[in-house]
Design a protein with these regions (language model features):
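ABC ATPase "signature
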Residues: 246-247, 255, 321
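Conserved ABC ATPase "signature" region
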Residues: 23-33, 90-91, 128, 132, ...
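Conserved signature/switch motifs of ABC ATPase nucleotide-binding domains
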Residues: 105, 160-163, 181
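The conserved cystathionine-beta-synthase
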Residues: 286-306, 312-313, 328-360
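Short coil-to-helix segment of the ABC ATPase nucleotide-binding domain corresponding to the Q-loop/switch region
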Residues: 121-128
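Helix-to-loop junction immediately C-terminal to a conserved catalytic motif
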Residues: 75
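Conserved ABC transporter NBD signature motif
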Residues: 83-91
């Protein structure tokens, strides 16, 4: 997968003596010390991220972790103090205002937590608003807006005023407005955080369905690890302006980088995330059909404290499984050939199936 967005050594400072604060960052001084000496707040410090094309990349952290500040740097709503941002192989940190405007209009779109809609306008004209600003003729912009309306499930609401809609419906308008532009990159800042839990779950599902079809690059910000795990192909966890870990949901749950991440992961329902491949035995004990007799099999089972073992044929082909009680019966009967007790109908799961889906 190609890299779509690259953030290199990015720091964002707010306050008076930025030059002095930058020096102190390079010297490795801590946030508190820099604030005390220069009056500068370090919102983001030395962030490095690579976001792949078509990936749903979640940036997660508590409030004050710098996640929103960082994302607003991608479309330069916030100016970086140090470092660079690259989009599709172009350094956008040094672009002129004119070029930047083109990128914001054509290549990126943003969805906000509190929707950011124009309450006195209808659904249709809210969705077409960005296209209107670009000077696109009415007929064409309304055609695009209608396509976008269909995608997010707002058909029939075109002429309603936005302030008459529920929160979930309003956020659908926000999403449709962002999509009307056909952006390559979608930035979503706590987009579902203001919604009721049930509506929120529904919007997450809809976003995942949309992403299946659209395959956009989405940077999604949240403070909620369950949401991050449900949505993210990969997750970056931020704390105090620094990126502390980047990984797939499973990597973050099974191998947290530090105590901070561990504390976050403690409340998560692992069954929804951990897959068969991460709990399976990587070097399983097997029974070889022509070679192993009851005595050897019982010994293997005792050693590993297992009541059943997989059976393989001469060509390493999986034949089924064998149960301890049946092996004990064979031994009692004095039979050496185990083929009569191999159970061929064995429930199986795919490697990427979650534990929750595996259990009845």
């Amino acid at each position: 997968n190609m890299t779509k967005i690259e953030i290199k050594d990015l720091s964002i400072l707010f306050g008076p003596e930025k030059a002095k604060a930058k020096k102190m960052i390079k010297q490795g001084k801590c946030k508190q010390e820099i604030l005390k000496e220069t009056g500068c707040t370090i919102a983001v410090r030395n962030a490095n991220l690579e976001i792949k094309e078509g990936e749903m990349f979640v940036i997660m952290g508590l409030s004050g972790s710098g996640k929103s500040t960082l994302v607003r740097c991608i479309n330069r709503l916030n100016e970086p103090s140090m470092g660079e941002i690259w989009l599709s192989g172009r350094n956008i940190t040094s672009l002129s205002d004119k070029d930047l405007l083109q990128i914001r209009r054509k290549e990126m779109a943003m969805v906000f937590q509190h929707f950011g809609l124009l309450p006195h306008r209808t659904v249709l004209s809210n969705i077409a608003f960005g296209l209107e600003l670009q000077g696109i003729p009415k007929e064409e912009r309304e055609k695009k807006a209608h396509e976008s309306i269909a995608v997010v499930g707002l058909k029939g609401y075109e002429n309603q005023r936005v302030d008459e809609l529920s929160g979930g419906m309003q956020q659908r308008v926000g999403l449709a407005r962002a999509l009307a532009n056909n952006p390559e990159v979608l930035l979503m800042d706590e987009a579902f955080s203001a919604l009721d839990p049930l509506i929120r779950e529904q919007m997450q599902d809809e976003l995942l369905d949309l992403q299946e079809k659209m395959k956009r690059t989405i940077v999604f910000i949240t403070h909620d690890l369950d949401e991050a795990i449900k949505l993210g192909d990969r997750i970056a966890i931020m704390k105090d302006g620094e990126v502390v870990q980047v990984g797939t949901p499973e990597e973050i749950l099974t191998d947290p980088a530090d105590d901070y991440v561990t504390r976050f992961t403690e409340s998560v329902d692992r069954g929804r995330v951990v897959t068969a491949s991460s709990i399976m035995l990587t070097q399983p004990i097997v029974v070889r059909i022509r070679k192993d007799g009851p005595e050897a099999i019982i010994r293997k089972m005792r050693e590993k404290r297992l009541y059943a073992l997989p059976v393989i044929g001469t060509d390493e082909q999986f034949l089924g499984e064998i149960r301890l009680k049946d092996v004990l019966r064979l031994r009692k009967e004095g039979t050496r050939d185990i083929s009569s007790i191999v159970m061929k109908e064995v429930p199986s799961v795919l490697e990427n199936m979650t534990v929750e889906d595996m259990l009845p």
